[in-house]
Amino acid sequence: MSEMTPREIVSELNRHIIGQDKAKRAVAIALRNRWRRMQLEESLRVEVTPKNILMIGPTGVGKTEIARRLAKLANVPFIKVEATKFTEVGYVGKEVESIIRDLTDVAVKLTHQQAMEKVKFRAEELAEERVLDALLPPPRDAWGQAEQKEENSSTRQVFRKKLREGQLNDKEIEINVAVPQMGVEIMAPPGMEEMTNQLQGLFQNLAGDTKKKRKMKIKDALKALVEEEAAKLVNQEELKEQAIYNVENNGIVFIDEIDKICKRGEVSGPDVSREGVQRDLLPLIEGSTVSTKHGMVRTDHILFIASGAFQVAKPSDLIPELQGRLPIRVELEALSSNDFKRILTEPKASLTEQYVALMKTEQVDVQFTEDGIKQIADAAWQVNETTENIGARRLHTVLERLMDEISFDATEKAGQAFVIDAAYVKARLGELVEDEDLSRFIL
């Protein structure tokens, strides 16, 4: 689990996301509270439940990006789902419990990676010995049995040195390696994914592990053998227990587009993909036990972060019980022209930086001037104001249109330099931005 302070978390998010300080503070506090809870005594820890968050803001202002970056920072089981993908239990479509099953799969994978990392050094030693055995097979006795090998013979040490220095990387050897089982793919009817997962696991277990002699280069053999030896050193049952503990105490679920499951007006008949989904989400958020292929998972201490644009619906259109389960409300502001300018230059791997790097691969030098960047930001903001406001995503459209000519002709213009200044931007985008009908279809 990440031990970063709220200030450090916000600072890290600032490297990728412009503005939205309230939302950053809220998720930073929530993430730190996960760590604080784990420092408490067991009797008190059980009583401390997470304060779930509802992020409200127009499209393209950074809600999903905050979740994406948070997942990388947290180093805990994290899953992002779209609320619109689910339907009420009993109807065709995904059930909300599959969120916890998927989160548990993520946790098992994460725990497995961490466990493999811990035993990597020992696995590398064992893999090295197996490669040396293949290079220097031990002599056999009269009965055809391999004699005890000399671990520290001078020849073996010479080969070990060469192996570690990479001098033998391209030499081919024949080794016994575990053969990956043929995957049994079963098409799942909607709502029956769990049953098909169990069937697939059953078929794979029936097949068992088989080994096969293969000829491969030493560098590839080492990689395969390290994985094989590491897998032997790891206790799979312990891994599952750790993963379930990790999900129950550190898991985070990000539910996007929650506004799309609000009830709109008076609807007669069952509203299976809206209010029904909200009612199914309630027990998950409040705390229930979900059956997964790895074991039973309690959701009492999983943190839920929901987000939505709420352009048509309002947060008050959510059913009251669900509103009560999302006590922390954070509003994200719409982006201004100045925000667009900062988005183009300040974040790590900004859009302008990406285009410059892409063109460099063709030996074309592209430079964005300050007035050119301001003109691009103004153009994107103006189109958002006059047509549909899609936030920072508009910058992708505008930049792609602006760079169209350079990108297409780059192969013939190797060695040339292009300066994207205000005049260049006006010449390419001026007419489109001013003509509302054109910008609706092209930008």
UniProtKB/Swiss-Prot annotation:
Where does the protein principally reside? cytoplasm
Write down the CDD domains for this protein, in alphabetical order: RecA-like_HslU
Any signal peptide, and if so, which residues? none
Mind telling me which GO cellular component terms the entry cites? Answer: HslUV protease complex
Checking Pfam families in the record gives: AAA, AAA_2
**Recorded GO MF terms:** ATP binding; ATP hydrolysis activity; peptidase activity; proteasome-activating activity
Q: Where in the cell is it found?
A: Cytoplasm
Q: Does the keyword Cell inner membrane apply?
A: no
State if ATP-binding is listed as a keyword.
yes
For this UniProt record, the keywords arranged alphabetically read as follows: ATP-binding, Chaperone, Cytoplasm, Nucleotide-binding
Q: Which of this chain's residues are annotated to bind ATP?
A: I18, G60, V61, G62, K63, T64, E65, D256, E321, R393
Against SMART domains, the record matches this protein to: AAA (SM00382), ClpB_D2-small (SM01086)
InterPro entries per the record?
Answer: AAA+_ATPase, ATP-dep_Clp_protease_ClpX, ATPase_AAA_core, Clp_ATPase_C, HslU, P-loop_NTPase
One GO BP annotation of this record: proteolysis involved in protein catabolic process
The protein's matches in PANTHER family, at most eight in alphabetical order, are given as: ATP-DEPENDENT CLP PROTEASE ATP-BINDING SUBUNIT CLPX-LIKE, MITOCHONDRIAL-RELATED, ATP-DEPENDENT PROTEASE ATPASE SUBUNIT HSLU
How this chain assembles, per its entry, is: A double ring-shaped homohexamer of HslV is capped on each side by a ring-shaped HslU homohexamer. The assembly of the HslU/HslV complex is dependent on binding of ATP.
> Which family does the record claim for this protein?
Belongs to the ClpX chaperone family. HslU subfamily.
Task: Describe the task this protein carries out.
Answer: ATPase subunit of a proteasome-like degradation complex; this subunit has chaperone activity. The binding of ATP and its subsequent hydrolysis by HslU are essential for unfolding of protein substrates subsequently hydrolyzed by HslV. HslU recognizes the N-terminal part of its protein substrates and unfolds these before they are guided to HslV for hydrolysis.
What name does the UniProt record give this protein? ATP-dependent protease ATPase subunit HslU
What organism is listed for this UniProt entry?
Vibrio cholerae serotype O1 (strain ATCC 39315 / El Tor Inaba N16961)
Q: In the UniProt record, what gene is named as encoding this protein?
A: hslU
